Regions:
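Residue-level recognition of the N-termini of beta-strands and the immediately preceding loop/turn
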Residues: 3, 65-66, 93-95, 217-223
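Short amphipathic alpha-helix with an adjacent loop that forms part of the alpha/beta core around
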Residues: 56-59, 120-125, 167-172
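Metallo-beta-lactamase
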Residues: 91-150, 247-256
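Active-site metal-binding motif and surrounding structural segment of the metallo-beta-lactamase
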Residues: 42, 48-97, 176-179
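Divalent metal-coordination and catalytic microenvironments
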Residues: 5, 46, 55, 72, ...
């Protein structure tokens, strides 16, 4: 069975003013929205300030969403008001899967599912999710999300620099089919975010080692996301930079088969 990942947003927190202008009701690769994605039309990954608009632009059925998976609680990924509004559209409410230590407000229509690290959870008969440790601000309860759909494996690894040792060894020989990697910082050295976000030079070092360790295969598609436009060249140029080390660049509205 083929699955689909829809990128609803691919930005870090420096949003373009064009989102309130000519890109108000359309996607543009150089006017990115808050990072979020939709798996198989019913599994939402993060819900930030722009997620409802992105769902509408993509003509996705928000009422069909059953589960929301949270990477962490920074406001560009976690908007409680938008989550409540989304839950009100669903038929049976919304399950919110979050790290066990996440501090969350009460949200009407939302059932919180607490996730311990490195423990697989059966979401339903076809999907399993595992939260992995991520190198990001601890107070936001960060986790990367490993999804297994039958024989397919997807790692959604935004907001976290490098790889935490336990996560790296957990993923040894995982042979991911799809990797969504944090690429907040562009193609230059010396950025201070090295302990919480990846840069292009960091990814150049990481990807060959991930292949050596079996985390990814030769045929694994690696998409860079969570890009800060103020730290990157335009999308078309970034695509060429990423291609030079075997990666692709996600854009809002992009649909990827799995």
């Amino acid at each position: 069975m083929e699955h689909e990942l829809l990128f609803l947003g691919t930005c870090a927190a420096d949003f373009s003013p064009r989102l309130k202008g000519d890109c108000r009701d359309r996607f543009d690769p150089d006017a990115r929205r808050s990072s979020a994605a939709l798996l198989d039309g019913r599994y939402l990954i993060d819900c930030g300030p722009h997620t409802p608009d992105a769902l509408a632009i993509a003509e996705a059925d928000a009422g069909a969403i059953t589960d929301l998976f949270l990477t962490h609680t920074h406001s560009d990924h976690f908007d409680p008001a938008n989550i409540e509004a989304l839950a009100a559209l669903t038929r049976d409410g919304l399950r919110l899967w979050a790290s066990a230590e996440a501090q969350l407000p009460g949200m009407k229509g939302v059932t919180v599912m607490r996730m311990e690290k490195f423990t697989p959870y059966a979401v339903n008969g076809e999907l399993t999710v595992t939260g992995l440790k991520a190198n990001h601000e601890k107070t936001t309860a960060p986790q990367w999300l490993l999804f297994t759909l039958g024989e397919k494996k997807l790692l959604y690894a935004l907001d976290g620099a490098w790889y935490v040792n336990e996560t790296y060894y957990f993923l040894r020989n995982a042979g991911l089919d799809l990797l969504v990697a944090d690429a907040t910082v562009g193609d230059y050295d010396g950025d201070y975010r090295v302990a919480e976000h990846n840069s292009i030079p960091m990814l150049r070092l990481l990807l060959p080692s991930l292949r050596t360790f079996g985390v990814v295969k030769e045929e694994t598609r690696v998409f860079l996301s969570h890009l800060a436009p103020s730290l990157h060249r335009p999308h078309s140029e970034t695509e060429k930079i990423a291609a030079s080390f075997g990666a692709l660049v996600a854009r809002d509205g992009l649909r990827v088969s799995l």
